[in-house]
Amino acid sequence: IVLVLLVGSLYSSSFLSPDYLLQQLKVASFLGVIATGAMIVILLGQIDLSVPWVVAAGGMMATAATGWGPVGSALAIPVGVGCGVALGLVSGAGVAYLRIPSMVVTLAVNAVAQGLMIVHTGGFSPQDASSPAMRFIATGQTVLGIPNALVVWVIVGIAAVFLLTRTTFGRTVYAIGNRERAAYLSGARTRVVIMSTFALAG
């Protein structure tokens, strides 16, 4: 990464400018938040291939909620997050209770989410706009000029570190990732943790 930055700075004097770096960090923030959830799933020894359409479904349902008026605008973010959590719970149930390989069940959930969104939109681009809160998080910035999206990424990252290193849930995630059966025999509620992890990733 350092080498890329150095080479880029040779071609453009503004490549390493604070404004450009903050812009790139704002773009990276969205992927960073998504990657945080995916990382916890990987620590379980599983994989989540439903990310593309779970993210798309959450965003599309959030913007759809905005079209419901003031109440819908206030509930837009909870609706989007709830949609992701619901799809994550489906994936988690398939892995934890039905014992379907995570690669298979999450790929299926991804396809189902895609189909549901096509039915919801009729195959056309959604026409509803984002809510003020969504625009504030996505494009706003603090008084210091730091993008709000970057602040959210930092908060999510700190919360993930705390969850994984300072809680029983985090220790159980690592234990399941090392050997699920051993974690189960030691008394850990492995199924609940697996479902919760996929819900968090959603």
Predicted region positions:
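Structural signal for alpha-helical transmembrane segments and their membrane-water exit/capping regions
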Residues: 2-16, 44, 118-125, 162-168
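Alpha-helical transmembrane segments in multi-pass membrane proteins
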Residues: 4, 30-38, 54, 58, ...
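Single transmembrane alpha-helix segments in multi-pass membrane proteins
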Residues: 5-73, 93-100
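Hydrophobic alpha-helical elements at and bordering transmembrane segments
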Residues: 21, 25, 29, 112, ...
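Juxtamembrane helix-boundary/capping and inter-helix hinge elements in multi-pass membrane proteins
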Residues: 46, 99-103, 129, 178-180, ...
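Helix-loop-helix "hairpin" substructures at the membrane interface of multi-pass membrane proteins
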Residues: 71-80, 86-91, 95, 143-202
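Transmembrane helix-bundle core of multi-pass membrane transporters
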Residues: 102-166, 193-196
